[in-house]
Amino acid sequence: MINQGIKAALNPIAFQGGPFTIHWYGVIIASGVVLALLLAVREGKREGIPEDDFYDYLLWALPIAIICARIYYVVFQWSYYSQHPSEIIAIWDGGIAIYGAILGGFIVLLVFCHYRHLSSWLMMDIIAPTLIMAQGIGRWGNFMNQEAFGDITTRAHLMAQHIPNWIINQMYIGGHYRIPTFLYESLWDLTGFALLMLLRHRKHLFRRGEIFLTYVMWYAFGRFFIEGMRTDSLMLGSIRISQLLSIVFFVSALIILIIRRHKNIPWYYNGINKN
């Protein structure tokens, strides 16, 4: 009786015309990026940072982040891609790793701030809430592709969590219902976004960089536990790579936060002085 609610999976293709195919995955990711950019520009204006700096940063960061995200994924799936090299560039089918994108964007930000004489800590504090918002939105691309899911479960169990039927139906994959880990991470990210925006508007209580460090710890903490429920984790032997990185990032951010608290780091300020 429970399985009577099963419906066909949603079409991952948004638009198709001639040789051109646009996937929902790309549309959703792009929407998250655009919203993040608009929010960063708004927050940057409050700190006296010209909006062109954010456009210029994105111009460099976006392609490099995508490349790094894909490289990260391919490296840890090399046993497959070494046999299917033509699929290495097929990012429209999914297969990018957020940690790779974050690392790529972070490196670009440090270089960009150096040459623009901007405070890297201030820029990271501005970008952190927008980034986790984009991450929360982007997880719905995984939903459309029926990926980033967890172990086998039952429809009754999903209904008991008050998950809408249209999400439950999409979680019917390969003849089984799956734990919607994409949903858990999306909700975790969007909750983190609300928290970080609250901190941004109470920044007088913080030192420079602490909002960004809070983002790192928040995301790493949630990702560690959610990753443990997934069945498609990138592995290094028996170790889930994302869980390992989550531990490294959480501990590193906590140590940096403690060190900066014990140093004579100025409390939050307005302005774009380089530090």
Curated annotation (Swiss-Prot):
Transmembrane segments: 20-40, 58-78, 88-108, 118-138, 209-229, 239-259
Listed GO MF terms: phosphatidylglycerol-prolipoprotein diacylglyceryl transferase activity
PROSITE patterns per the UniProt record, alphabetical: LGT (PS01311)
GO annotation, biological process: lipoprotein biosynthetic process
GO cellular component annotations of the record: plasma membrane
Protein's UniProt keywords contain Transmembrane: yes
EC number: 2.5.1.145
Residue numbers binding a 1,2-diacyl-sn-glycero-3-phospho-(1'-sn-glycerol): R139
Pathway where it operates: Protein modification; lipoprotein biosynthesis (diacylglyceryl transfer)
Location in or out of the cell: Cell membrane
Membrane topology listed for this record: Multi-pass membrane protein
Keywords noted in UniProt: Cell membrane, Membrane, Transferase, Transmembrane, Transmembrane helix
Similarity comment: Belongs to the Lgt family.
Role: Catalyzes the transfer of the diacylglyceryl group from phosphatidylglycerol to the sulfhydryl group of the N-terminal cysteine of a prolipoprotein, the first step in the formation of mature lipoproteins.
Name recorded for this polypeptide: Phosphatidylglycerol--prolipoprotein diacylglyceryl transferase
Protein's organism: Limosilactobacillus reuteri (strain DSM 20016)
